[in-house]
Amino acid sequence: MEQRLAEFRAARKRAGLVAEPSASSQSTQTSGEKAEAATTPKAPSGWLKRFLVWKPRPPSAQAQPSLAQGAAWPRGLESQPPWSPAEEAPPPPQPPPPQPLTPRDRSLLTSVTLLKVLLWLVLLGLFVELEFGLAYFVLSLFYWMYVGMRGPEEKMQGEKSAYSVFNPGCEAIQGSLTAEQLERELHLRPLPRR
């Protein structure tokens, strides 16, 4: 068993040495390509993309099982070490706080929202006349729900959330969970056995 382990480590070391030259050749980009890559804007990810994108764990977070652990696991589970909270990745850095809107930007945002509501009312009246008012109303609810459920990346800087109506300063409420804490509780905790 020790011989197989030594062979595995040697093969992994050789693969690491072979991978290094190819990585260094890829890093020799021209300055124009680097500038182009730096100026290319990233598309904001929506709430649906966050749920559909699979992010593999980095190799450093994947622990190699010891021989004693490998012998104790049932056959077929050798590649999956048990979950432990010590393997959690550190939380991502917090973005800087949003800058408050200037009065000009606030009036523009208010007028755009007012125009959207007026357009919605005019279209609702038109569809009521055509006897499709209920269908239009229900379908338009999906749009307003989408606008209300956008992720933080998609919101404009300084745009208030719906929560700020009930908690104007958006201050933490004693005993409540943050979104990160709730997500950690829902996703990282093992499922309860029934």
From Swiss-Prot:
Residue ranges of the region described as Disordered: 1-43, 58-104
Keyword Endoplasmic reticulum: yes
Start-end of Polar residues biased regions: 22-32
Biased composition regions of type Pro residues, renumbered to the chain: 82-101
Chief place of localization: endoplasmic reticulum
PANTHER family per UniProt: SAYSVFN DOMAIN-CONTAINING PROTEIN 1
Protein name from the UniProt record: SAYSvFN domain-containing protein 1
Organism: Bos taurus (Bovine)
Gene, per the UniProt record: SAYSD1
